[in-house]
């Protein structure tokens, strides 16, 4: 978010693109979770996975580095919550397709690295 450049939409951010991918894939696996989890882990993981990209987008729209950083930190918390739910789903073997949940856990780790890099970038911009 360089002040000298033209405005970039949040949908152009690589970290948002990855978080959107996570949200969509979580929505797909939720269809395969047992009914008894409908009001427990399904609601929780849908909410937390949606919150990642939503917080990145909201922070981006604030135009102040410190606010953007704070929303990215909230996104990071939601990302870890999503990862925790995925570990639970994996450990209970709710999803039978080999590697599908593991792939989402790896995607969470990839997003976290990107998000940490984006936060570091925003902190640097704030100092300049």
Task: Tell me what each language-model feature is.
Residues 1-128:
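Amphipathic alpha-helical assembly/interaction segments
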